[in-house]
């Protein structure tokens, strides 16, 4: 029986941070560069609002408006490089599930996006949403689902996994990843994730 790996969606599979930047530029009329959306911070929640305030556009942008647009159409959100290829490779050795803390109202649009970008029928689960404060933590959900490892960009979720006896990979290089998570592995991109798992099996 294959071991189960849980994978986050936003900024792990889907380039949501980049979609947010481009949306913000379009709405505000201010051309912020990718590096301006990668600001060191110890707090994930409120990250975008702090960036907008720093550049004086907080009165023109609202995360809830961006999220509302995603309910019906997520086509502007790109697939991160090598995500589909590496996940397909991992599926040969592991049972892959997706665990997201997205607002549940995004479920239908999320399923459409996943079907367009990933191969196979991968189970999708919704964990606690930080803005709504409802549901189980990712660590609790991963433990309940029998996942031995979580791949996530959010250090809080990785800490939650470890607290529940689930291994964690902190994915990507984002400004909100300043906090240290003891016992977590850091992988900057999907090729690094594949390299890590290849090394585990040797």
Where are the model-predicted features located?
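Substrate-recognition "cap/lid" segment bordering the active-site pocket of phosphatases
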Residues: 101-151, 155-159
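Metal-dependent phosphoesterase signature
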Residues: 44-85
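Short catalytic/ligand-binding loop motif for oxyanion handling, primarily in non-cytosolic enzymes
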Residues: 14-17, 21-22, 105-109, 133, ...
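Substrate-recognition element of Asp-dependent hydrolases with the DxDx(T/V) motif
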Residues: 74-79, 83-113, 125-127
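Acidic, Mg2+-coordinating phosphoryl-transfer loop and its flanking beta/alpha structural elements
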Residues: 147-188
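Active-site neighborhood of HAD-like aspartate-dependent phosphohydrolases
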Residues: 1-61
């Amino acid at each position: 029986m294959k071991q189960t790996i849980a994978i986050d969606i936003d900024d792990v599979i889907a380039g949501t941070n980049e979609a947010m930047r481009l949306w913000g530029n379009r709405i505000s009329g201010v051309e912020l560069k990718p590096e301006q959306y990668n600001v060191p911070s110890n707090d994930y929640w409120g990250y975008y609002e702090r960036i907008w305030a720093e550049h004086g556009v907080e009165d023109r942008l609202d995360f809830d408006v961006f999220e509302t647009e995603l309910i019906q159409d997520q086509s502007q959100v790109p697939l991160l490089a090598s995500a589909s290829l590496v996940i397909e490779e991992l599926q040969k050795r592991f049972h892959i599930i997706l665990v997201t803390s997205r607002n549940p109202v995004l479920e239908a649009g999320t399923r459409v996006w996943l079907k367009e970008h990933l191969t196979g029928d991968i189970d999708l689960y919704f964990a606690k949403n930080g803005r709504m404060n409802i549901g189980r933590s990712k660590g609790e959900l991963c433990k309940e689902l029998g996942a031995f490892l979580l791949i996530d960009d959010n250090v809080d979720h990785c800490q939650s996994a470890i607290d529940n006896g689930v291994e964690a990979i902190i994915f990507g290089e984002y400004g909100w990843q300043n906090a240290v998570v003891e016992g977590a592995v850091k992988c900057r991109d999907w090729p690094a994730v594949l390299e890590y798992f290849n090394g585990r099996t040797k």
